[in-house]
From Swiss-Prot:
It comes from Shewanella oneidensis (strain ATCC 700550 / JCM 31522 / CIP 106686 / LMG 19005 / NCIMB 14063 / MR-1). It comes from the Bacteria. One of its GO terms (molecular function) is hydrolase activity, acting on ester bonds. InterPro entries: AB_hydrolase_fold, UPF0227, UPF0227/Esterase_YqiA. One of its GO terms (cellular component) is cytosol. Belongs to the UPF0227 family. This is UPF0227 protein SO_2251.
Length: 179
């Protein structure tokens, strides 16, 4: 089972396409949609929804996959549920990058402060990160610098921020899920 978490653009048709591509790894791909506008509510909702979905699966190794803002949540929700996660062009600091896009971006800082201290150290090797070398939205090298001590980093030389084509990375994602 793969949980797919969309980015800030929840209605993008690319989300359906990415889910279809992920079905080459596991036919059971589940979209977990969230508001993107209310971080504290989103966190509570995502925790409850993932727990509920896991009760209805016999997969011994479910995987979280998120793109952009969805990768922010995939890392945290995956950690809190003991799941591996794949972070694609993660928005690591939405308290900064979401300024002007949502009403209370400071809620992300509050969530980060309440998260388990040093959670990435406790989550080492339980996530992999795929970064677009030419991400037009986020500074990928800063993400690599922040995450490389904890997670494997895979670079992509062609995909934009929304990462419409996962095909080149599907074998590595599958190996990570099963490994």
């Amino acid at each position: 089972m793969i949980f797919y978490l969309h980015g800030f653009d929840a209605t993008s048709p690319g989300n359906h396409e990415k889910m279809r591509q992920l079905q080459f790894i596991d036919p059971d791909v589940r979209l977990i949609s969230y508001s993107t506008l209310h971080p504290k509510h989103d966190m509570q909702y995502l925790l409850k929804e993932v727990a509920k979905q896991m009760q209805h699966s016999d997969d011994p190794a479910p995987l979280m996959v998120g793109v952009g803002l969805g990768a922010y949540w995939a890392e945290r929700i995956g950690f809190l549920n003991g799941l591996k996660s794949v972070l694609i062009n993660p928005n690591l600091h939405p308290e900064n990058t979401m300024q002007g896009k949502i009403d209370r971006p400071e809620e992300y800082a509050d969530i980060a402060n309440k998260c388990v201290s040093e959670f990435r150290m406790k989550n080492t090797h339980k996530a992999m990160c795929i970064l677009s070398r030419f991400d037009e939205v986020l500074e990928s090298q800063l993400s690599a610098d922040e995450l490389s001590r904890y997670y494997a980093i895979e670079w992509d030389e062609t995909q934009p921020h929304k990462f419409p084509q996962l095909a080149a990375h599907l074998p590595k994602i599958k190996a990570f899920k099963l490994g």
